From Swiss-Prot:
Region named Disordered: 238-258
Keywords associated with the record: Endoplasmic reticulum, Lipid transport, Lipid-binding, Membrane, Mitochondrion, Mitochondrion outer membrane, Transport
Family: Belongs to the MDM12 family.
GO cellular component: a single term: ERMES complex
Cross-referenced HAMAP family: Mdm12
GO BP annotations, alphabetical order: mitochondrial genome maintenance; mitochondrion-endoplasmic reticulum membrane tethering; phospholipid transport; protein insertion into mitochondrial outer membrane
Species annotation: Zygosaccharomyces rouxii (strain ATCC 2623 / CBS 732 / NBRC 1130 / NCYC 568 / NRRL Y-229)
Domain of life (superkingdom): Eukaryota
Name of the molecule in the record: Mitochondrial distribution and morphology protein 12
GN (gene name): MDM12
Compartment(s): Mitochondrion outer membrane; Endoplasmic reticulum membrane
Primary location class: mitochondrion
PROSITE patterns: SMP
Domain comment as written in the entry: The SMP-LTD domain is a barrel-like domain that can bind various types of glycerophospholipids in its interior and mediate their transfer between two adjacent bilayers.
């Protein structure tokens, strides 16, 4: 069963895009960069106007592992509720998501940090086709990718995945899931925006490193047994407090009470 998403509401949500950008920057700060790259950060992030195609495959009770994972971080134990639910969905995305990054390329010869060059990277044409879990538990929304799904448009000769079968198995033993199957990276090195110096484009070594960073990020953060967790408890508490502090005004101009 397929269903539509009001993607325009997400795409136009500047707070959501900013939150995703901040999360990615936090991850970039935690990784070890090679000696020739420093100060890697995300300048801009946009979900794009193209929505993913989502197909519902199964509805069930949430896995026990999800409750155990939440209870490790929650002061109050979360127990199964009749309102808890889990969806197994197929997600296909070939859209116009756009990420702009900046970094400094370092030349360490004849001495350390002998020269640095500004680098700008633009990521676009992202493609993925995966099976994932979406679970709702006590005002928590959990999302975890399980495996990649065979896709004629994404399974090229350069794919890290074995195209035999409907669900792909990785050619490299440590890569059971790739999530991002297609991605375009454009690299510019030099003072293009200030109008000084020359600009180098398509620096393959740096582009390959960035590709591996994003694949590692997704595998560590959103592929099973890890997941994305969205907690709505704080938002509800803030809304409740605001409703208590702010009087409600009717159309006639009179103030109504509780």
């Amino acid at each position: 069963m397929s269903f539509d998403i009001h993607w325009s509401n997400l795409e136009s949500d500047t707070r959501l895009n900013e939150s995703i950008k901040n999360h990615l920057n936090t991850y970039l700060e935690s990784i070890s960069l090679p000696s020739y790259v420093c100060n890697l950060r995300i300048l801009d992030f946009s979900l794009g106007k193209t929505a993913p195609n989502i197909t519902l495959r199964e509805i069930s009770d949430p896995l026990d592992e999800l409750y155990r994972g939440l209870n490790e971080d929650e002061p109050d134990s979360i127990t199964p509720s009749p309102n808890d639910i889990q969806f197994l969905v197929e997600v296909e995305y070939k859209g116009d998501l756009l990420v702009t990054l900046a970094a400094d390329l370092v030349l360490n010869y004849p001495s350390d940090n002998f020269m640095t060059l500004p680098v700008k990277l633009t990521i676009s044409n992202v493609g993925l086709h995966s099976l994932c879990l979406v679970a709702h538990l006590s005002k928590h929304l959990l999302i975890s990718f399980l495996c990649d799904i065979s896709d004629v448009d994404l399974d090229g000769n350069e794919s890290l995945l074995d195209p035999k079968g409907h669900v792909l198995s990785p050619r490299r033993s440590l890569e059971r899931i790739s999530i991002i199957r297609n991605m375009k990276i454009e690299t510019e090195i030099g003072q293009q925006h200030s109008g000084e110096g020359s600009v180098l484009r398509s620096v393959g070594r740096l582009e390959q490193f960035l590709l591996e960073i994003f694949k590692d990020l997704l595998r560590k953060e959103v592929s099973w047994p890890s997941w994305i967790e969205l907690d709505f408890n704080d938002d509800n508490e803030e809304d409740l407090q605001q409703s208590k502090d702010t009087p409600t005004t009717a159309n006639t101009g009179t103030t109504t009470t509780n």
